[in-house]
From Swiss-Prot:
UniProt-listed GO biological process terms: nucleotide-excision repair; SOS response
Name the UniProt record assigns to this protein: UvrABC system protein C
Record-annotated UVR domain positions: 214-249
Top-level taxon: Bacteria
Assembly mode: Interacts with UvrB in an incision complex.
Any single Gene Ontology cellular-component annotation: excinuclease repair complex
Function summary: The UvrABC repair system catalyzes the recognition and processing of DNA lesions. UvrC both incises the 5' and 3' sides of the lesion. The N-terminal half is responsible for the 3' incision and the C-terminal half is responsible for the 5' incision.
GIY-YIG domain residues: 25-103
GO molecular function, one term: DNA binding
Similarity section: Belongs to the UvrC family.
Gene it is expressed from: uvrC
InterPro entries reported in the protein's UniProt record: GIY-YIG_endonuc, GIY-YIG_endonuc_sf, GIY-YIG_UvrC_Cho, Hlx-hairpin-Hlx_DNA-bd_motif, RuvA_2-like, UVR_dom_sf, UvrABC_protein_C, UvrC
Length: 614
């Protein structure tokens, strides 16, 4: 087998041979092949000789280019009539042959969408997984910011009174929830709105999200005037509030950008050899969200070449206009001509020039920077998981790690928690709290046994690749039987001598005790996981403790309301937050509560509301 230097010499020989075979200043396409004739890379060049020569400058090579070049065994050259023909041929070869180093990586798993569920009365929710066919009647996005997405959802709910509750909650309601009371929902669960009227509201929401809100605004304005003329001021105020909500949503989604028609903006952001191409979509002038793509550059292609190759690979149907984030000497005619030949229609490739165009491209560039920085962070997360697998002797990097901890004060208000970590970092939607039921003496080991047992009874279908428990030998013994039966590897992390940070020790399932270098990245990663579980456990314990103390103090101070009646009131309304907004008539419906007592409760809650917690 040849060593690294011999392989590099063979690659340089193949490159020199190919370089000598072409005339100066001719455009074309080159294919690089490795051992067993595997296609490594396809590239195009305006000047083939100049481009191929650039691969011979070892001192100017990046690590990625060097890694690819030393695998080259032979090259194939195709000379074309012009650069446009070379661009089209390159795109065709990449799409059909999928070379190893011409991969475009798409990343949409982090980004939020707005989803309308498939239901008689659809709910509107934030959703992070695009591939959910059959589960929705409308899907909008992706949006870069979950904060912006939640604001849009809240605005849509306020404007059209749509529900956002889970289906099981919707199906079991006995009375309208607090969302109805604060005019955020039309309470379809209690038939406060007909199916037909609710469907109309959903349709209006769809139109608003696609920028077709002008006709909705006109209709609402006419209704507002009509209600006002008829002195139905309450209905007129509802229409007015809906108009304000639509205006707020338009500003949030960036409708007022001065961009018209179907337009895409492609921003380019680069860190070393990794590119992020951020595509921001405008359809009918509406900012429809954005999508990042990642390209690892291993060839000596220019930024313009990479953008051109990218566009021809990802688009099946181009919009009318595409703005690209490239220097002013970029030749837009080459790409426009290539698209015309490929699509049989005109597509205008432009550089941004007006204030609105530059503003939109700046937005796309900021998105690209954030997306690429996020990807770099996630690459670091992958490294942590690989080191994790090595230390704990796992066959592969874990995709799901569960971390457990308990919290209590002398056995009171005990809670156990489960924190989850995956390839995308901490998965907070997967966190779980377990109120300890069987242990009252503060025995941490028995508490952990209860938590682990309940976890796999309550959620039997989702198994972790590894479990990390905050504890020592006692916790290991407490959970060993259950986790061994399930075949789940685990370890306990305990404070070291003097409880000094960085001296933690690990008790493996087989009883082995190991430690790590306090300064190692893996130690920091494991301690972060342990600390997150500890934080969540303490928070859960405090909420339980404070809530119970507060509830007890609150209701016991009301004359005529004892422990039994207090529990009945809370059970009826479900939460103190719901009680705050309850009317006297509603409170009097609680069994055992007279109208007089109900008024006393309502007055007391009103006076005390500044001290209440939801």
């Amino acid at each position: 087998m040849k060593n690294s230097n011999e392989r590099l010499n063979d690659a340089f020989y193949a490159l020199k041979k190919a370089t000598c075979s072409v005339r100066k200043s001719v455009p074309g396409v080159y294919k690089m092949f490795g051992t067993e004739d595997r296609l490594l890379y396809v590239g195009k060049a305006k000047d083939l000789k100049k481009r191929l020569s650039s691969y011979l400058s070892i001192n100017r090579m990046s690590v990625n280019v060097y890694t690819m070049v030393k695998q080259i065994v032979r090259l194939e050259i195709t000379v074309t009539e012009n650069e446009t023909e070379a661009l089209l041929l390159e795109a065709k070869l990449i799409k059909s042959l999928k070379p190893k180093y011409n991969i475009i990586m798409r990343d949409d798993k982090f980004y939020p969408y707005i989803l309308f569920s498939k239901h008689k009365y659809p709910r509107i929710v934030l959703h992070r997984e695009k591939r959910s066919e059959g589960r929705y009647t409308g899907l909008y996005g992706p949006f870069l910011s979950s904060v912006m997405t939640r604001h849009i959802i809240a605005t849509i709910k306020k404007a059209f009174l749509l529900r956002s509750c889970p289906d099981n909650f919707f199906a079991t309601r006995a009375r309208p929830c607090i969302e109805y009371e604060i005019k955020n929902c039309s309470a379809p669960c209690m038939q406060k709105i007909t199916e037909e009227d609710y469907a109309k509201a959903v349709q209006m929401a769809h139109k608003a999200l696609t920028g077709q809100s002008k006709e909705i605004q006109c209709e609402l304005f006419e209704m507002m005037c009509r209600f006002s003329n008829n002195q139905d001021y309450e209905s007129a105020i509802v229409c007015r509030d809906r108009l304000h909500a639509l205006k707020s949503m338009k500003e949030c989604m960036g409708f007022q950008t001065g961009i018209h028609g179907d337009v895409d903006f492609i921003a380019v952001y680069k860190r070393q050899d990794l590119y992020c191409m951020q595509v921001v979509f405008f359809r009918d002038g509406v900012n429809y969200g954005s999508q990042p793509y990642f390209i690892e550059s291993v060839g000596n292609a220019s930024d313009a070449d990479i953008v051109n190759m990218f566009m021809l690979q990802i688009y099946n149907d181009f919009p009318s206009v595409v703005y690209v984030d490239l220097p002013s000497d970029y030749d837009t005619n080459i790409m426009s001509t290539a698209i015309k030949q490929l699509m049989k229609r005109e597509v205008d490739i432009r550089l941004p020039a007006t204030r609105d165009e530059l503003k939109a491209m700046g937005l796309a560039r900021n998105y690209a920077m954030e997306a690429l920085n996020r990807r770099v962070r996630n690459t670091a997360q992958d490294t942590d998981l690989e080191e994790f697998a090595t230390f704990f002797d796992l066959l592969k990097a874990p995709e799901r790690i569960e971390i457990y901890d308990n919290s209590h004060i002398s056995g009171t208000h005990p809670y156990g928690v489960m924190v989850v970590c995956g390839k995308d970092g901490l998965l907070k939607k997967e966190y779980r709290k377990f109120k300890i039921n069987t242990v009252t003496n503060g025995d941490d080991c028995s508490m952990m046994h209860e938590v682990i047992s309940r976890r796999f009874k309550e959620i039997p279908d989702v198994l972790p690749d590894f479990i990390l428990i905050d504890g020592g030998r006692g916790q290991r013994s407490a959970v060993y039987g259950e986790l061994s039966r399930l075949g789940i590897p685990f370890a306990c992390i305990a404070k070291g001598p003097g409880r000094v940070a960085g001296t933690e020790v690990f008790y493996f399932s087989n009883g082995e005790k190991l430690s790590l270098d306090p300064a190692s990245k893996l130690m920091h990663f494991l301690c972060r996981l342990r600390d997150e579980a500890h934080r969540f456990a303490i928070t859960s314990h405090r909420k339980s403790r404070d809530g119970k103390l507060q509830f007890s103090t609150l209701l016991n101070d009301i004359p005529g309301i004892g422990k039994t009646k207090g529990k009945a009131i809370l059970a009826y309304f479900g939460s103190i937050q719901a009680m705050k907004h309850a009317r006297v008539e509603e409170i009097s419906k609680v069994p055992g509560i007279s109208l007089k007592l109900a008024k006393r409760v309502a007055d007391y809650l009103k006076e005390s509301q500044t001290t209440l917690r939801a």
